[in-house]
Amino acid sequence: MASEILVDHRQKALALLKLDADKILKLIQVQMDNLTMPQCPLYEEVLDTQMFGLSREIDFAVRLGLVDQHEGKKLLDKLERELSALHDAFTKK
């Protein structure tokens, strides 16, 4: 039973981290849709703050043993790739 609870907590932790990553993507997409320049200081500040916050959440979950370090890095890498793709798409408009 204890191992089932641990697995459940791990699944919940990863699901919450993925939800936070999705929120960042949506926020950035909205900003990019409404800004004329992706190098806007506000855009960069929001991106930096949100990415830093998510990285700290992931680090905390890893330290608690709820998320594998590789899985956390994979989540951040995926988000960074998607944000880069959004930026590239915006600059090619």
Curated annotation (Swiss-Prot):
Superkingdom classification of source: Bacteria
NCBIfam families: PRK13666.1
Family (UniProt): Belongs to the UPF0358 family.
Protein name per Swiss-Prot or TrEMBL: UPF0358 protein BPUM_1375
Organism: Bacillus pumilus (strain SAFR-032)
Lineage, highest ranks first: Bacteria, Bacillati, Bacillota, Bacilli, Bacillales
